[in-house]
Structure formats: C-alpha cells, structure tokens
C-alpha cells in the first residue's frame, strides 16, 4: 500500500542523483542504472518516479540502505549520513542519457 505522503512528494525529491562509479558504469552494459534515492521511498515510488522523469519502462529495482559511516576531523568525531541506493533495470531498447553529448 502506498502512503498518501508518497503522492505529495515530487519525483525530483525521490531521485536525488545518479551514481557514477566503476561498478555503475559496468552495469550500464546490462541496461542497469544506479541512483541515490530518498531513504524513506519504496520500490513502487522509485519506479513511478524513474518512469515519469525519464520516460522509460522499468523492469526491476534492487534497493539497499547503506549504513552511516564515522568521519573524523582531528579530535572531533562525526557521522556521514545513511543513504539508500537503487539499481534500476530498464527494458530492452530504453536508455537514460547520463552523459551529455557535446
């Protein structure tokens, strides 16, 4: 069941930014894209946001919540925030242009 608060959030607030790492670029060959998403969003809202923003068909979504990490600056100890990552598999023929063509 989808909460009514999920409908009120815009798609741009759910999808924060794409992940560009070595592993993420290898996954592009399999038509899989990685995004950092809102911690409290679920797979249904992520799917609808991706389909709305990029006009593509989503087949599968894998999500994981990564733990917060300790960060140290001198004698002071702080924490990097916890975040959620989504790996989105698109249907055959659909692409998301992450790199601009110049």
Swiss-Prot record:
Family: Belongs to the universal ribosomal protein uL23 family.
PANTHER family (UniProt xref): 60S RIBOSOMAL PROTEIN L23A
Protein name: Large ribosomal subunit protein uL23c
Keywords, comma-separated and alphabetical: Chloroplast, Plastid, Ribonucleoprotein, Ribosomal protein, RNA-binding, rRNA-binding
NCBIfam families named among the record's database cross-references: PRK05738.2-4, PRK05738.3-4
BP term (GO), one: translation
Keyword Cell division: no
Highest taxon of source: Eukaryota
PROSITE patterns: RIBOSOMAL_L23
A GO CC term attached to the entry: ribosome
InterPro entries per record: Nucleotide-bd_a/b_plait_sf, Ribosomal_uL23-like, Ribosomal_uL23/eL15/eS24_sf, Ribosomal_uL23_CS
Annotated compartments: Plastid, Chloroplast
Organism listed in the record: Phaeodactylum tricornutum (strain CCAP 1055/1)
Quaternary organization: Part of the 50S ribosomal subunit.
Pfam families (UniProt xref): Ribosomal_L23 (PF00276)
Gene3D superfamilies in UniProt: 3.30.70.330
GO molecular function: rRNA binding; structural constituent of ribosome
Function: Binds to 23S rRNA.
